[in-house]
From Swiss-Prot:
<protein>
    <recommendedName>
        <fullName>GTP cyclohydrolase 1 type 2 homolog</fullName>
    </recommendedName>
</protein>
<dbReference type="InterPro" id="IPR002678">
    <property type="entry name" value="DUF34/NIF3"/>
</dbReference>
<dbReference type="InterPro" id="IPR036069">
    <property type="entry name" value="DUF34/NIF3_sf"/>
</dbReference>
<comment type="subunit">
    <text>Homohexamer.</text>
</comment>
<keyword id="KW-0479">Metal-binding</keyword>
<dbReference type="GO" id="GO:0005737">
    <property type="term" value="C:cytoplasm"/>
</dbReference>
<feature type="binding site">
    <location>
        <position position="65"/>
    </location>
    <ligand>
        <name>a divalent metal cation 2</name>
    </ligand>
</feature>
<dbReference type="GO" id="GO:0046872">
    <property type="term" value="F:metal ion binding"/>
</dbReference>
<comment type="similarity">
    <text>Belongs to the GTP cyclohydrolase I type 2/NIF3 family.</text>
</comment>
<dbReference type="InterPro" id="IPR015867">
    <property type="entry name" value="N-reg_PII/ATP_PRibTrfase_C"/>
</dbReference>
<feature type="binding site">
    <location>
        <position position="337"/>
    </location>
    <ligand>
        <name>a divalent metal cation 2</name>
    </ligand>
</feature>
<dbReference type="Pfam" id="PF01784">
    <property type="entry name" value="DUF34_NIF3"/>
</dbReference>
<dbReference type="InterPro" id="IPR017221">
    <property type="entry name" value="DUF34/NIF3_bac"/>
</dbReference>
<feature type="binding site">
    <location>
        <position position="337"/>
    </location>
    <ligand>
        <name>a divalent metal cation 1</name>
    </ligand>
</feature>
<feature type="binding site">
    <location>
        <position position="64"/>
    </location>
    <ligand>
        <name>a divalent metal cation 1</name>
    </ligand>
</feature>
<feature type="binding site">
    <location>
        <position position="333"/>
    </location>
    <ligand>
        <name>a divalent metal cation 2</name>
    </ligand>
</feature>
<feature type="binding site">
    <location>
        <position position="103"/>
    </location>
    <ligand>
        <name>a divalent metal cation 1</name>
    </ligand>
</feature>
Length: 385
């Protein structure tokens, strides 16, 4: 029972495309040879010494948080992270990271979080804007030359939409221009305004074919200076991006929902805290695995009653509480991302079946390991103004 590391990477890159990662992030293979043969995969949020202890020799450790996120100028064994890298390499173990690409993927980190709360996801809190891969060309062509220009740009790769080819749209109008000294007009005279019946021809083409379409258009167009526009088409928002919005099976009080959150997540020393009217009804919820205070403004206008995330700081939470009735539920960072480990395991098991041993490491890697609370020390019935 085994698989090549390269085959596992292919599956992970399909599930959590690297192009979804934030520009500052570090994702993918950290150490290991893609041609290595694996017999086991261990999944965790963090790569720590205790977690690595559970990874079999020649196995893969798949983690959410990058071990080497910021600029690194040494992996000497005398450094904490360097020592981990050396341990992995010496024992033939590999390390792979799926971080913000897993945050934005569908399903991804926030989908897993929503699932453990019993939410049915129906929207993305902050959709990921796609990279423009298509251009729309608008070309103004004298009527008698339209067919030739269309044929040329189609041959260069334009005009394909799904299973259709030679697609275009046109409308007739009037073009106007005045040739000046040095021009060699096909139509009109130097110094005289000329008006010509022209078609506005629109076609789409892959952005990668821009140079070919431009060359073909120039070659077929009768004018020495054709009038044309190129618009980069941004894909509409889809089901990928940060955070998710979902609906509970039935409304429940905020206090009941907070209890639901606490029961669904692994216990941590910081537990679960919330702000809002305990008796308010909650039916629609926004969630974001990991640090999510950057999405507070979106949660405030998302038609939800509550927002679950991690690492909420005092001032952003205070400003939100003053301006919005959306309840905030703050959980431990590690706990909010741990459900993703099970999701990633399902992805791998569904592809490799019994050919690979896939397990989730249950070691709590939350850095906070102690906590204390003195009940009734502080009133929560109001605030100082």
């Amino acid at each position: 029972m085994s698989a090549r590391l390269a085959d596992v990477i292919e599956v992970l890159d399909h599930a959590y495309p690297p192009r979804f990662a934030q520009s500052w992030d570090s994702v993918g293979l950290v150490c290991g040879d893609p041609e290595d043969v694996l017999e086991a995969i261990t999944i965790a949020v963090d790569a720590t010494p205790a977690v690595i202890d559970e990874v079999p020799d020649s196995g893969l450790l798949l983690v959410h948080h990058p071990l080497l996120l910021h600029g690194v100028d040494t992996v000497a064994v005398s450094t904490p992270k360097g020592a981990l890298v050396h341990r992995l390499i010496r024992s033939g173990r590999s390390l792979f990271t799926a971080h913000t690409n897993a945050d934005s993927a569908s399903p991804g980190v926030s989908d897993a979080l929503a699932h453990v709360f019993g939410l049915t996801v129906d929207a993305v809190l902050e959709p990921l804007l796609g990279v423009a891969s298509l251009d729309k060309w608008v070309i103004y062509v004298p009527l008698e030359h339209v067919a030739a220009v269309q044929a040329a740009v189609f041959e260069a790769g334009a005009g394909h939409i799904g299973d259709y080819s030679h697609c275009s749209w046109s409308v007739t109008g009037t073009g106007q221009f005045m040739p000046h000294d040095g021009a060699s007009p096909v139509v009109g005279s130097i110094g005289a305004i000329e008006r010509v019946a022209e078609d506005r021809v629109e076609v789409v083409a892959p952005a990668r074919a821009r140079a070919a379409v431009l060359s073909a258009m120039h070659a077929a167009h009768p004018y020495e200076e054709p009038a044309f526009d190129i618009f980069a088409l941004v894909p509409p928002p889809g089901d990928v991006g940060l955070g998710r919005i979902g609906t509970l099976p039935r409304p429940e009080s905020l206090s009941a929902f907070v209890a639901r959150v606490g029961a669904a997540l692994p216990q941590t020393s910081s537990g679960v805290r919330a702000t809002g009217d305990p008796d308010m009804l909650v039916s629609r919820v926004a969630v974001c695995g990991g640090a999510g205070d950057s999405l507070l403004s979106l949660a405030a206008v998302a038609d939800v009653q509550a927002y679950v995330t991690a690492d909420l700081r005092h001032h952003p939470a205070d400003e939100h509480r003053r301006a919005s009735n959306v309840a905030l539920i703050d959980v431990a960072h590690w706990a909010s991302e741990f459900p993703w480990c099970g999701q990633a395991a399902d992805v791998l098991r569904s592809h490799f079946g019994t050919a690979l041993s896939v397990r989730v490491c249950t070691i709590r890697t939350d850095p906070w390991n102690l906590g204390a609370r003195r009940v009734n020390d502080v009133s929560d019935s109001g605030r100082d103004q």
